[in-house]
Amino acid sequence: MAVREPGAWKLDGLEPCSASTIALCLAEATIGPTAHTWTPPAWLLPHQRPAAQRIAGTLPIFGGALLADAVGLGKTYVALAVGTRYARVVAVVPAALRAQWRRTAERLGLQIDVVSHEGLSRGRDIPGADLVIVDEAHHFRNRGTQRYDRLARGAASAHVLLVTATPVVNRGADLVAILRLFLPDHGLAAVGVRSLEQTVASRDYIILAEGAAVLTVARTSGSLPFAGQRPPRPVDLDLGRPPPLGARQLVSLLARIDRLRFTGFSGPGAVSLLRAHLLHRLASSVEALRLTLRRHLAYADRAVTAAQSGMQLSRSTSRRLFGAGDDLQLVIPFVAPAAIDHDLETALVAERARLLDLLQFLPKRGHRNPKAVRLAQVIHSRSQLRVIVFTAAVSTAIDLAFRWGWRRTAVVGAGRARIASGPISVDDALDRFAPNARHSRHPSRAGDVMTLIATDLVSEGLDLQDAVVVVHYDLPWTPVRLAQRVGRVARLGSTHRNAHVFWFRPPAPLEQRLHMERRIAMKAVTQMEILVPETSRVGTARKLNTLLELREHLSLMCAEHARSDGSGGPRSDDAVRIAVVCGPPMLAAAVRWTWNGHSVPQLVVLAGRPPRAVHDVRSIFRIIRRLFANSASRRAPPATLMRALWHTCRDRLTEWGQGPTDSATRRLQRRVLARGLAASRQHNLQLLTPLDDVLDHLGSGQPTGMERELDRILDAKPSPGSLAAWCGRCRPRVGPADVQFDGILVGDGTIGELPGEAFENLHSAQHSIH
């Protein structure tokens, strides 16, 4: 319905206008800060330029940003384009992607330092930088690791650009961990997240997602216009549940695994984790299980020797149970050697006997394998297409290659590669498999690789879009891996319209024990709640996040209304533009938060009786669409809605001004006050002044890295110089925040809510922040 102009009413401070005039303000408020005056490099594709402008507009305000576009849309190029605005750029990337990042930067004429995740884990420092780009940033979700600590402290003074299509892997705390690399705990208080830590602890994921959206670009291919060919569309093909050995043998083997006691381990849930690890290996192949059982046997031998000699085993001993790149590396902190004593020796000897019996029961290499036979049929039927087969274990990959004689096949895993003639480098193997995507020389037919069997080493970030077929031979532990695997093929630069995705499901006896499909489905639901643009479930390669798509479509819808009558000029004086329409008592406001010269637009929507802030994107989309559909009204805006808008904004400003309230900040403040009290008793005036400055900076809020640096200083004997240096590294103190209203679209209350549109009983997480 066309929007008619309102009558000639006017209230103090309000300037009546049409809904289409307000629409442009709402569109800008939906997508957040944007560097409109910056022209991105010409080598970006049309759909990448708005992303670069949004990231460039966000970094100076929050000290960081999250680029979470779906896999295959060219996040590397967007990040490098933003890097052209900085003098010193460091990219922190997985080791497998270092060469690709360097090649891409060189091809674009850019100078960057590249540091690997693994290098940080080994204690390497980050070079001085103005911008730190963290590729596959979800690998830094564990705050207890050395790599997280190195990154947090090394990037504390720089702008941080997080690049990942999966900012949430298992739970909402994953997102908060990486955001705290550049945000203080209250860094999103003005936009509705009073405390990052408290919000995720209370599982208010809708509120967390709405607040984090102002510094996030997370789009799917479904919400973007493409000038050229779109990334291939995944086509799912289910291969069923063939077992890795005969059905009767499988049942007998499972019975023997059930008898294992995993003697010699401690830690919460250690036995369950280790049993799941063995079952997961069996789901892959007998060869993978054989290798893991040999590791368990070696561990038992060491434990028996330790018991006989009165020694204890180190934690590193238990790490040898897991292969390089094993997903269960994530849970190694929960699996540790038990205290070894003579009473344990008898139990260890019995466990060793059970392991030997299990190893002797396993069929020999080359045994009947229905799962491998089914895979061979798939590859043979597509012999002219390049195929990537993802397995959970290198031993499985090698076994499969041997089964079909290494015909034009390469195996990649654990940082190594092999073809029929012997070992080669990983880069060489990938170049042979995907010469077009990797801009390498085409090999001779004899050296060409048509089938790549790989672990998830190659599932992240690599350009392998010469391939058109992906086979999930084994299921990983998280949907993240599934989406990343498909992303090697379904990405920009592919000449294929479709990507064929084949699924092997675990045999029924194993699925009943592992619940792999259910685990993946549950984690996918969590991802969809918080800023993950698309994910996978077993049997569905691409499941789009309709909430994030709605956010992009909401901005487009508002922009279309703004263009419908050519409105959208500057407002007169400081008046607030308002459009009142006939409709339910609902309100959508484009507000602008300002502090330290920065400006952050945000969309605030109120509805219900009494009016409350609405956080769910689906409800917001429905409200705004309903308001746009109604004709203009001559009535004044409902006073209850206007008061509710003001109170909502006032409460957020109050919470912003209160500063951080997280336990880490409070603890540091107590430590600094204790140091100050001691310095006062000693009449140490030289130390009191910098301690006072430190308290001021803590009151403004600091990211995790600066908090940890201060802890180290306080652990030692702090000097005026060390405290002053810490203050010098802190970002400028945050001044008081203010709010202005760019435009308000409101229903006058003359039309009641339709059945199903009652917003009084929204999702429990949809409430105003008080």
Q: What is the predicted function of each stretch?
A:
Residues E5-S18, C25-A29, S494-H770:
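C-terminal accessory region of SF2 helicases/translocases
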Residues V114-G128, E136-A158, L181-F322, R382, ...:
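Inter-lobe coupling linker of SF2 helicases/translocases
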Residues M1-A70, Y77-R85, R667, V672, ...:
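ATP-dependent helicase/translocase motor core
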Residues A81-T84, D130-A201, S459, V469-Q484, ...:
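Signature of the SF2 helicase/ATPase Hel1-core->accessory helical subdomain module
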Residues H36-L44, A70, V78, V82-G83, ...:
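Conserved Helicase C-terminal RecA-like lobe
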Residues A19-H47, Q53, G63, G74-Y148, ...:
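SF2 helicase/translocase NTPase motor core
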Residues R141, W406-E511:
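Conserved RecA-like P-loop NTPase helicase motor core
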Residues P60-A65, H159, Q384-R386, V449-M450:
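Pre-Walker A (Motif I) flank of P-loop NTPase domains
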